[in-house]
Amino acid sequence: MALVLHAGSGNKNAFKALIAAEYSGVKVELVKNFQMGVSNKTPEFLKMNPIGKIPVLETPDGPVFESNAIARYVTRSKADNPLYGSSLIEYAHIEQWNDFSATEVDANIGKWLYPRLGIAPYVAVSEEAAIAALKRSLGALNTHLASNTYLVGHSVTLADIVMTCNLYMGFARIMTKSFTSEFPHVERYFWTMVNQPNFKKVLGDVKQAESVPPVQKKAPPPKEQKPKEAKKEAPKEAPKPKAVEKPEEEEEAPKPKPKNPLDLLPPSKMILDEWKRLYSNTKTNFREVAIKGFWDMYDPEGYSLWFCDYKYNDENTVSFVTMNKVGGFLQRMDLCRKYAFGKMLVIGSEPPFKVKGLWLFRGPEIPKFVMDEVYDMELYEWTKVDISDEAQKERVSAMIEDLEPFEGESLLDAKCFK
C-alpha cells in the first residue's frame, strides 16, 4: 500500500514528510478533504493516534504519528538516502538541528503566535519572553549560517527540511521583515530553501508576513433572547436601573495585567532604585560610599544575593564572543529589571575565560518567572550567598566594586545590570 498522510493541505508539519518524499522519490498521498476537528475525531483516526493530533502516516506496518518521526520514516524508506548525511557525525548533526528546530525555533514561534490567534491565553510578559528566546535562537542559527549554506554538509538534508518548515510558519504568519532583518543569514537561507524545486512543489509561493497579527479578543457571549409575551396594559412604573449590562467599550476593554508575585511580597526597607542611583552616582571613594551604602540598605528578609558561575568556561576561547555571550544574557534578563541588580565579570588575560556573576533578587529565592523564561539561567551554577560568612560578604563587595585583581586574576570585562 502507498503511504497515506492524514493532515490538512496547509499543515506545516505535514510539509516535512511531503518535501522529504519529493527528495527521496517516495510516494506519499495526502488524504483528500481532511477537515480538522472532524476527520481527526473519528474512531478510525483515534485508533491511529489516540489523542487526535495530526499529522499521522499510514504505513504497511502500522501508523506513525509526530511529524519529525514521520519525516524520518519517509527518509529512511530510501536506502542510503543523502538526506541523512554521509557519515555518523553528519547523522548526529542532522538530529542535533532537528532537536534545535523543534525546541528552540518552532516552540518559541508558537509561544508568540498562538496566543495572538486566540489558541492560547495571551500574557504580555510571556510574549516578551518568547520573542527574546526566539531572537536568541535565531541569533545562534544566524551565526552558524554565516559560514554555511546548509545546516549540515554541502547539500540539503532532513535538517534543512525540518528547519525550513518550522521557519515557514514564522515567516508566513508573524515574523515581519523588520523582525527578520536582524538575522540576514537566516533570511538568505530561508528564501534559498523555499525556492528549491522540491520545496516549492509543496509550499508554493511563500510570502512574508506584513504585520504581526493583533491579539484576538474573545467575542462576548450571545445574549439570551426571551420569548416575546403578549403586551399587557399596566400602570407605568418608575424606570429601574439596568442590570449589570456593560457598554460595548467596557466589555472590550483589556483586563488589567495580573500582578507579578514579587509585587505581592511584604514591603522591604531596601529600595532597589535608591541603591541603583547610589551605584551609578558614586564616582570616588566607591568602597566607602557605595559599598557601605549597599550593606546599610541590604534587607535579607526582602532580597537575596546569589553567585553564579558559568558551567562551560572551556568554551570561552574567544574574548569578544565571551563578552557578547554575557551581553546577550543581560539583555534577556530585561524582564526582571524592576526586581534585580547584577554584576557579571569576564575573568582572565588568556583563554579560556571564566564568567562569574553576582545577582541581587527581590524575594528569598531566584524568581520563578526568571528561571522559566531566561534560558541562560541553566547555563550557570547558582549559589545563595551566606552573608554571615565574612569571606562571602567580602566577595560580594569585590564583585560590586569590580575589584582587580579578582581572586588573583585580571578582569577582561565587567558588566552591570541595573
Curated annotation (Swiss-Prot):
Q: Protein name, please?
A: Elongation factor 1-gamma 2
Q: Which organism is this entry from?
A: Oryza sativa subsp. japonica (Rice)
The record ties this protein, via InterPro entries, to: EF-1-gamma_plant, EF1B_G_C, EF1B_G_C_sf, Glutathione-S-Trfase_C-like, Glutathione-S-Trfase_C_sf, Glutathione_S-Trfase, Glutathione_S-Trfase_N, GST_C
Question: Which residues are in the EF-1-gamma C-terminal domain?
Answer: 258-418
Q: Which SMART domains match?
A: EF1G (SM01183)
- What are the disulfide bonds? none
Q: Does the keyword Protein biosynthesis apply?
A: yes
Biased amino acid composition, Basic and acidic residues? 221-246
Q: Where does the record place the GST C-terminal domain?
A: 87-215
User: Which PANTHER family does UniProt cross-reference here?
Assistant: ELONGATION FACTOR 1-GAMMA 1-RELATED (PTHR44372), ELONGATION FACTOR 1-GAMMA 3 (PTHR44372:SF1)
Region annotated Disordered sits at 210-265
Subunit (UniProt): EF-1 is composed of four subunits: alpha, beta, delta, and gamma.
Listed A to Z, the keywords are: Elongation factor, Protein biosynthesis
Where do the GST N-terminal domain residues begin and end?
Answer: 1-82
Job of this protein: Probably plays a role in anchoring the complex to other cellular components.
Question: Per UniProt, what is one GO molecular function of this protein?
Answer: translation elongation factor activity
